[in-house]
């Protein structure tokens, strides 16, 4: 059973969110160009540990703002962490990529994107970022271009991309690295899958675009990889890619067979493709949770669906928002699910484990005073950029098709998972 631990209201529509790989930090990028980092309550935190920087939440914990700044003119489109969590990168509709500290928000380096093509003076517009390795940053754009940037020792950006590919004719909606081969010496991926428009493409760091799919006649909006356990017979260790579409269908692709999809799971279909709810976000369920081969999918009607990839069916559904679609999904380092969409972020965890954590916390008392130990948290200052709440550009929508205005069925604060309780 999943339980909503806390709810975070935002000052503008959420475009992107990321979580730190080893710390309880959540960073959001908003439609008004603001970027803000929050500290999520952990198992060691006290429910009474509140201060003036706390945000309104549920009864299980307090989310605190660590820093906030007006990072981009226009909207903040995308965020990504470095592989070690020491650096954060953002990109906005101002065609600028910024590198900054996750702890303080202070900018360390920044670059501008090159023109869309040789005949244009207009800069390309970023759509998505992904850190492939400690040395490589990928950036996909609205024009369908893919830029590869080298990263220096401290994570700083080199001003010029080392390579440029054009795998798609429409904006790049997702970037998913493929697991490295057994012969890999670095342990980091060298190939990745991108989606854009109605096609999927595979690109190699050294050799460029390796494969492009057939036209799928539906928008491909999000993707995640399942490294093992779902491949065809006699090839169970072959990776499988799950791709969410605009028509509410989750398609499965076997690694190496990139021409066309192999399986279809109807997650939020309609009577026709146009009636289906868009699948805008997806994340693989961590193996540590013991749920099996499952993925969590964020839907345009505001619902979140747990999909059993082996049984090819939706296992359960719960509600993130009554009106706005789910734009982002993550699991943090404590394997809690974080859903974001509209002007709300919610943190979810298994109800049983949350109750056990509370009981353990009650037992941790000072020997002399018999009181809970407070959990400390230091708030950091913003960088020197504009930080006025009045700086709010007009609301801007992503290019991807959205159906978030349709109301979904009401969902309670906790959700049962058959076979997972």
From Swiss-Prot:
UniProtKB keywords: Nucleus, Repeat, WD repeat
InterPro entries in the cross-refs: WD40/YVTN_repeat-like_dom_sf (IPR015943), WD40_repeat_dom_sf (IPR036322), WD40_rpt (IPR001680), WDR55_POC1 (IPR050505)
Main location: nucleus
Subcellular localization, as worded in the UniProt entry: Nucleus, Nucleolus
Disulfide bonds: none
Placement of WD repeats on the sequence: 9-48, 71-110, 120-159, 220-263, 277-317, 321-358
Compositional bias annotation for Basic residues: 395-410
KW Transferase (keyword) present: no
Biased composition range(s): Acidic residues: 44-53, 355-366, 378-388
GO cellular-component term (any): nucleolus
PANTHER family: WD REPEAT-CONTAINING PROTEIN 55 (PTHR44019:SF20)
Family assignment from sequence similarity: Belongs to the WD repeat WDR55 family.
Protein name (Swiss-Prot/TrEMBL): WD repeat-containing protein jip5
Organism: Neurospora crassa (strain ATCC 24698 / 74-OR23-1A / CBS 708.71 / DSM 1257 / FGSC 987)
Classification lineage: Eukaryota, Fungi, Dikarya, Ascomycota, Pezizomycotina
